[in-house]
Amino acid sequence: MNVLHVVNISFVIPYFLGKQLNWFVEKGNKEYVICSPSEELEKFSKDYVFEYKSIDVLRKISIGKDLRAVWSTYRYIKEIKADIVTGHTPKGGLIAMLAAWLARVPVRIYLRHGLVYETSHGLKRALLINIDRLASRLATKIICVSPSVARRSIEDGLNPESKQIVLAHGTCNGIDIERFSKQEANADASNALKRQFGIREGDFVIGFTGRLVRDKGIIELVRAYQEIRKLHQNVRLMLVGMLEIRDALPVDVVKTIKEDKGIISTGYVEYAIIEQYYALMDVYVLPSYREGFPTSVLEASAMEIPVITTRATGCCDSIIDGETGFFVNHDEKDLEQALQRLYDAPSLRENMGKAGRQMVVDYFRHEVVWNAIEELY
């Protein structure tokens, strides 16, 4: 079969697809990707064995450019004789589904990675909902990345329940349990990073990976850290990711991140080495306001790190409360108390870490999700 994936930026390819593409190529498929132009595309195409075409798939609405993207995608679908087209994210999904519908592709999959409208309001929210509804209408099947996204999709009238599925227990790609493993962690690399960031023996490292924006709960995380740091000078906060202009943090929080000696702000880190950073963490925190399915939580759990997260869409599916981590409210005091509880109990951290690893192995390893995709195809 000839399978085409449409994404808007190359950055997501290792997360959304990655070795899944290699796996399907070994089974006889030909894999193709449409993506906005990027220097990384050539490297990714060799790593993951796919052919690609660069087409501007913009995140923002631009009627002229969007129509050109639909036409270019349509022509590429015809050129490669695609049997299956999968569109990722609302904008990539809409362009992919419209082009595939026009080309009469028999299997058109819209992969709903989350509900981007959840934290939007007014006209913008209405527009985002209708983009999602249109992509859903043009698709023959919709994959929701988590049970909570699936439930909310029905509540918000995005599509009929009969049209959507969740792959196994969720995610779009699963987790590489061999790579994300405490036992397989590169000790030399971890020690080098500890020296680089000044992490000493006995330090308690609170970790986060992702975009440093309001939606991720970074304001609450920084303020909870400040409070617990007053009590324990060995507490460090490691923020692995970049500050962004879109949904930017307040000036005072940015100032704290840049100037607080206990905060390690790494900037951009290649996904290829992200496990080396997890290996430095004692607890992983994601106080997010919305997710599709936070794979970072599963990666941390696979590394035997206890997790603190919220009951937001997506996040609520990512831990077992009291067993692999704790749920907290979007409240810095609640988060501080959960951090204090884990700080005080090394044995609890160890037990939660082991339970988290087992959960990922049982329900979220790559092969579980890939087999579900194969059944759908």
Question: Where do the model's predicted regions map?
Answer:
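Short hydrophobic beta-strand element within catalytic cores of glycosyltransferases
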Residues: P306-T309
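Conserved acidic donor-binding segment of nucleotide-sugar-dependent glycosyltransferases
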Residues: D321-G322, F326-E332, R341-P346
